[in-house]
Amino acid sequence: MDVLYFAWVRERIGIPKETVETQAVTVHDLVEELKAREERYAVAFADLSALRVALDQELSDFDAPLSGVREVAFFPPMTGG
């Protein structure tokens, strides 16, 4: 599946997108796999309350299943005015 990183998440990880082979069942499982890869992922995903996730371009949560998902995007909460 494709994993996309936006804003400061992209800055901390150092890439905007990657294709990931995973056995993760939920988004949280995927995050744990990524954090175990390298320190830069652990830093980016240290505080999940500061992150939002979208699955196939629909806002979701970290307990959501990944079955059938083709794209996961991580980004900080948006503010508007």
Predicted features by range, described:
Residues 1-80:
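Ubiquitin-like/PB1-type beta-grasp interaction modules and other compact soluble beta-rich domains
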